[in-house]
A protein has these predicted regions:
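Boundary/entry segment of secreted carbohydrate-active catalytic domains
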Residues: 1-28
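Conserved beta-strand positions
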Residues: 4-6, 22, 144, 191, ...
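Substrate-binding cleft and catalytic face of glycoside hydrolase catalytic domains
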Residues: 18-199, 235-236, 332-337
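Noncatalytic carbohydrate-binding groove/subsite architecture in carbohydrate-active enzymes
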Residues: 118, 140, 165-299
Length: 400
């Protein structure tokens, strides 16, 4: 289940990740006219110009084990793509009319209100599904948007109501689903939610958005499977010791936030939605698509960062609904450090933090050698005593 966002030359191999998440900006995928790097694609009698995707295909082939050095698919990794929509003047028609405010946020909600935009996305998702549906360049998990309930920060939607937002998102989700599934029936499609479960810090609460989305999907396309890409950061984001937070993250669906401490609330709630909507038990899958803990290099936070990454991984490892645990960054991000977040396994000068070797060995026979020294830090006598179903014999990765 161990994963990382992005690809780092040398370190992707060394850490031994089994899951890799990549971001794709849809604004880079579309051109309004023929130009270098874009290819014509005719769909339902209309010709569009979409990015050739050569570089991304090469990356995904490498991750799937089909690069020139390993032509027989060795060391295959599961690839997750997150599809985002930034602002480009000439492509503003692809952004929902209520959200067309340049500079309002990093990413915007898609336009399902106007026919030209809908047709473009339908064609684009079919094109991408074809390119990334072959077993050599297969994308296993597709996520539409980033933290879509956070509609004032990551999925800007202007003044749209919750029901309008969820319905518009679900319509785009259905287009992506059909585009992906027509080529790769085993690939999964995910909704992205932040850690605000009942709190609405930057838009709507995750639970409210999920409920609206699930209801709309059931009413309009009940046969479609959907899954959840969750970001269970601590609250606040700078808190590493998630295990001792008894205020923001509590037991029960009434909790304000969901972190790795109480991630079971999410997975149990999804089980209840399966029952409500007649879905097969266990069919709604979860990936932890973004997570990180902060540590300035050389400071004591290195210990809590390492402990948190490992403890969280163990929790995910023994939750049968969670398929992946994907950490935010190999290297501290300059934009994030300006906000006090040092989420990388390295600092900007490639100083290796303690978390690097811990994370590297979490799914090996040496896992406990690296994690047992942190038992006292997290206040546990053993991992079995704090993690239901913990079995050290199941920690080493298989089928890698």
């Amino acid at each position: 289940k161990k994963g990382m966002q992005g690809v780092s030359e040398g370190y992707t191999e060394d850490v031994g990740v089994q899951h890799v998440l990549l971001n794709v900006d849809l604004a880079d995928m579309v051109s309004t006219s023929a130009r270098s790097g874009y290819v014509p694609y005719t769909y339902k009698g209309k010709t569009y110009y979409f990015q050739d995707m050569i570089a991304l295909e090469q990356t995904i082939r490498y991750l799937n084990g089909w690069d020139n050095d390993n032509p027989y698919g060795w060391h295959s990794r599961s690839v997750t793509l997150v599809l985002l929509m930034s602002w480009k003047d000439e492509l503003s028609y692809l952004i929902h009319p209520d959200a067309r405010k340049k500079g309002a946020a990093s990413y915007y909600t898609l336009n399902m209100q106007e026919e030209n935009a809908r047709d473009t996305f339908e064609a684009l998702f079919c094109y991408m599904g074809e390119k990334m549906g072959d077993h050599k360049s297969l994308v296993s998990n597709w996520t539409l948007g980033n933290e879509v309930n956070s509609c004032r920060m990551w999925n800007y939607s202007g003044n749209m109501s919750l029901s309008e937002n969820a319905a518009n998102y679900a319509k785009a989700f259905q287009l992506l689903y059909q585009g992906v599934k027509r080529t790769a029936s085993t690939s999964k499609v995910f909704i992205s939610l932040d850690h605000c479960w009942n709190k609405a810090d930057a838009g709507f609460s995750g639970k409210a958005f999920l409920d609206e989305f699930a209801s709309y999907m059931n009413q309009t396309a009940g046969w479609m499977d959907w899954n959840v890409n969750y970001h269970p950061y601590s609250q606040p984001l700078t808190r590493n010791e998630f295990w001792s937070d008894n205020g923001n993250t509590v037991s029960g669906t009434g909790t304000g936030y969901i972190s790795m401490k109480n991630i079971q609330i999410l997975t149990d709630y999804l089980e209840s939605l399966e029952a409500s909507y007649g879905k097969t038990e266990g069919s709604i899958r979860v990936i932890i698509g973004e997570l990180g803990y902060t540590a300035k290099a050389g400071q004591k936070d290195e210990d809590t960062q390492a402990a948190a990454l490992g403890y969280g991984y163990y929790i995910a490892m023994f939750n049968s609904r969670i398929d992946a645990y994907i950490v935010r960054a190999y290297v501290d991000d300059s934009e994030e450090t300006s906000s006090g977040l040092y989420l990388g396994l390295f600092d900007r000068s490639y100083y290796k933090k303690k978390s690097y070797d811990v994370y590297k060995h979490l799914d090996t026979v040496q896992s406990l050698d690296y994690m047992n020294p942190y038992l006292s830090l997290v206040g546990a006598g053993s991992w079995e005593s704090v993690i239901p179903g913990f079995d050290a014999g199941k920690l080493p990765a298989v089928d890698f």
